[in-house]
Amino acid sequence: MGSTAKLLIQIVVCLNMIAAQESELLCKKTGLDFKSFQEVVHVTSSQSDVLDNWQGFKRSGEPEAVRRQRADVFAKSLAPALELAREIGVSIPGTALAQRLLKKVLDID
């Protein structure tokens, strides 16, 4: 059960990464201060550690090769969850989408 829980944690983290990146993008485009948005979300039911620490989490200042490697690790970490879902006949399209979007989310592509 521990390994299954780890797979599910990776799904939650990666989907939260997508939500954080898209929220940041929309904040920038609409003029909403992202830091203020994070503070508001922190006290709501949509709070997430990934969103709370997004600027540090995505590490935009690191070399692209390092960010690319991190994105690859996150994408690979979703493969076992996708395989398990296929084996038990469960559709998890959000996870499949997250796997494809991770490089964009981490400012690589």
Annotate each PLM feature.
Residues 2-94, 99-109:
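Helical "substrate-binding/catalytic lid" subdomain
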